[in-house]
């Protein structure tokens, strides 16, 4: 199937993209934005409000990317805008402690079951890198287990793909990642507890932590199989391994306390990002006091940052988290209702067109996989027809709906998506699917 670029007037975006490639590698500051997976010209955005984006050519789109996850209440939420304006007038950074850091930390500790203490950083990547270092420092061990298809940022020991055999060491997935880093990273199959058990047994007393996306979001939205997270918890307890949940994507999205609240499995450490910053650059890692007290200056594990706990970002995060804390029952009931209606409507559209594709929805995130396989891990996700998805992406874009420009990224929505958006989405989706398969 040949994928044609969207028939949308993107002259200004195209001009910006060509200009950007002279000074920015690939013309973008994060690879997924380049539209390499779907083809065509990436959108250059001018403004956004609620569930809608406007690009540099004044085209408007209903947004299902949500800045890749942070916009649980939509773009330019008045509480966030006011908080950021007020703080900017007092200064954008001090390089010293502020009361707002304490208030945000208290909210995180109150909302997230595993978090007794929390350290603020500037990104999800910083959070996962710091958590892995902390787990190593706490246990005195070197190796970590991660899962194929789980993304934990661009830290060297996370950019590892599978080796040649089920129990081999990992190998670098990017130039610049050394074999020395790779040798301490073990790869397991997501949703395959027996594989994890074999890795632990083959590396007795050497594994510092198991890090997992409790709901995978970077190979499409893939929930954990029943018993998988519980099994990881039991395995870590039995072998004195630190269990780390990467909830950068799922934190505050699938429940007020994230996936750990939704599934009732409590990790030792949790990594957070996206929603916690209200759209500004914030990450965090937290967990048991006993482990967190190993972080400097209390303990020997070093981690620091000039802009960590930045007051501008903390004000934005506080606006979001305080709203979640005050209105969580209403908020998550609304999100669940939208998720259920969207999935049912999508399945109705698929049935009406005789298409046997797989849909996943968990809280305020989901995926439509262009495959009839039961998608439970990276291998089954990769059976999806990426050319068909690319054609679908452009068909939706032409009618004003912006989806992730990759089959293997989750869609996100928030409280800004209501009945009108649902109706528009499903009607447009029906036409787009029919067009792709005509």
Curated annotation (Swiss-Prot):
The encoding gene: hemL
Family stated for the protein in its record: Belongs to the class-III pyridoxal-phosphate-dependent aminotransferase family. HemL subfamily.
Documented EC number(s): 5.4.3.8
Gene Ontology BP terms: protoporphyrinogen IX biosynthetic process
One Gene Ontology molecular-function label: pyridoxal phosphate binding
Protein name listed in UniProt: Glutamate-1-semialdehyde 2,1-aminomutase
N6-(pyridoxal phosphate)lysine: modified positions: 274
Organism field: Salinibacter ruber (strain DSM 13855 / M31)
Highest taxon listed in the record's lineage: Bacteria
InterPro entries: 4pyrrol_synth_GluAld_NH2Trfase, Aminotrans_3, Aminotrans_3_PPA_site, PyrdxlP-dep_Trfase, PyrdxlP-dep_Trfase_major, PyrdxlP-dep_Trfase_small
Keywords for this protein: Cytoplasm, Isomerase, Porphyrin biosynthesis, Pyridoxal phosphate
């Amino acid at each position: 199937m040949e994928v044609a670029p969207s028939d949308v007037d993107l002259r200004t975006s195209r001009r910006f993209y060509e200009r950007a490639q002279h000074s920015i590698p690939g013309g973008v500051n994060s690879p997924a934005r380049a539209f390499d997976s779907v083809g065509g010209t990436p959108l250059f955005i001018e403004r956004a409000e609620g569930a809608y984006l406007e690009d540099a050519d004044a085209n408007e789109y209903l947004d299902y990317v949500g800045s890749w996850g942070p916009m649980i209440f939509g773009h330019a939420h008045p509480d966030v805008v006011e908080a950021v304006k007020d703080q900017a007038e007092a200064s954008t950074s001090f390089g010293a402690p502020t009361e707002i850091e304490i208030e945000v930390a208290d909210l995180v500790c109150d909302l997230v079951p595993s978090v007794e203490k929390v350290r603020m950083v500037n990104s999800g990547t910083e959070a996962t890198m710091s958590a892995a270092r902390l787990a190593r420092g706490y246990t005195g061990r070197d190796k970590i287990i991660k899962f194929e298809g789980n993304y934990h940022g661009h830290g060297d020991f996370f950019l590892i793909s599978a080796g040649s055999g089920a129990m081999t060491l990992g190998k670098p997935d990017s130039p610049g990642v050394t074999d020395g880093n790779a040798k301490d990273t073990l790869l397991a199959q997501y949703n395959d507890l027996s594989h994890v058990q074999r890795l632990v047994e083959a590396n007795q007393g050497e594994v510092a932590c198991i890090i997992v996306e409790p709901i995978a979001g970077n190979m499409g939205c893939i929930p954990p199989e029943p018993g998988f997270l519980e099994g990881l918890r039991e395995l870590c307890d039995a072998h004195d391994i630190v269990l780390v949940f990467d909830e950068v994507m799922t934190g505050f999205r699938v429940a007020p306390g994230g996936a750990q609240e939704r599934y009732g499995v409590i990790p030792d450490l949790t990594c957070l990002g996206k929603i916690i910053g209200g759209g500004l650059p914030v990450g965090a890692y937290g967990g048991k006091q006993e482990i967190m007290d190993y972080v400097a200056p209390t303990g020997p594990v070093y981690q620091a940052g000039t802009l960590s706990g930045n007051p501008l970002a903390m004000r934005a995060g506080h606006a979001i988290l305080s709203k979640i804390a005050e209105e969580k029952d209403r908020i998550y009931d609304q999100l669940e209702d939208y998720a259920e209606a969207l999935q049912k409507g999508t399945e109705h559209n698929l049935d009406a067109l005789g298409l046997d594709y797989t849909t996943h929805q968990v809280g305020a995130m989901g995926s439509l996989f262009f495959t009839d396989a039961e998608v439970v891990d990276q291998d089954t996700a990769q059976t999806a027809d990426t050319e068909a998805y690319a054609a679908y992406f452009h068909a939706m874009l032409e009618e004003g709906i912006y989806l992730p420009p990759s089959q293997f990224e989750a869609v996100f929505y928030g409280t800004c998506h209501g009945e009108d958006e649902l109706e528009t989405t499903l009607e447009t989706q029906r036409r787009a699917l029919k067009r792709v398969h005509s």
